[in-house]
Amino acid sequence: MSSSARGVPVLPDTIAAVATAVAPGQGGIAVIRLSGPMAQRVVRTITVFPGSQEWLSHRVLYGHVLAADGHERLDEVLVLVMLAPRSFTAEDVVEIHCHGGVIAVQRVMARVLEQPGVRRALPGEFSQRAVLNGRLDLTRAAVSYTHLTLPTNREV
């Protein structure tokens, strides 16, 4: 594992995952999150942004995810950019906020995973990267995991 110019450890791969629940009729918006050195390049490759929107950290951009042919618009999206080290994982993180329908999410996620240098995240891997990069301690990671896996609010 190498370090960036800012001293943040750099893991060699970029991970992606759907960060919101996706089920028929359960949500209007879904979030696909990427973290790692290729996050920006992947999203820039599959997305077109009208006008002259600046790609700045902690800003939202409006655009469309394009099919592999570069012409068909798969979905209208908002893209949130969080550059290292000012993100949950302390890596470059880019979120694609797309429509929440199952088909739309599958199509956008498939485009993300088609790109070289990106793979599907393992369960808990975003938190693992946050721990490895000093953004989260193990106690807080365990509490987050517990809250995410409880079936009801009554058990909190």
Predicted feature residues:
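A glycine-rich (often HGG/GG-containing) alpha/beta subdomain
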Residues: M1-L148, R154
